[in-house]
Amino acid sequence: MHRVRLIVAWSALPLALASFGATLYLEANSGSYSSGLLKNAAFIAAGFSTTGVGFLLAIRQERNPIGWILLASGLYLALVGTTTAYANYGVLANPDSLPGTEWAVVFEDRTWPMLFVGITAVAYVFPTGALPAGRWRPIAWVAGVSFAALILVTPFTTEAFADPFAAVNNPLPSLDPGMYALLINLGMAGALAGMVGAALSVRSRLKAATGT
């Protein structure tokens, strides 16, 4: 198991670097349809730093999930940058030049709940790597279930993609609008409660640690 974890951790670095390289290449060839230097730099910096910190924690404290959560979060940011660049190039700059651009748009536009999963999960297991006991544990489970629901349901909407990809057809089927709204609202409420609970649980543990 130790070897498997090391292989996974070390594999994440070249994957992240390859993703960043692909992003830069596609954006450099997208002309005026590029996301822009500032946005690309921000995504790459966030993805690289998160992946790097996660990698160091994962190989030094492999049983603590914080490193693995950060590693996964960094790879997600890297993939968002790459899929955005892929869509910019294949949909806007050179239409129909690349396969599967509609799936890249789905990932870029409809996986936004993932942006909040990592930081919420880290908050709940900080610093020991274990979920807090008592009242915080049920709230953590509510957060997990709510985020899972948002991730699963969000892509199946009838709404158009955000600009500049509004004209792209969603390759996935859509849920009934009423059912979709109900599931999204429940998921959002649970996720928001979970994020507030995560912040309060960190505050509670810090107060307990300092005796204040």
Would you name each region that the model predicts?
Residues 1-212:
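Alpha-helical transmembrane segments of multi-pass integral membrane proteins
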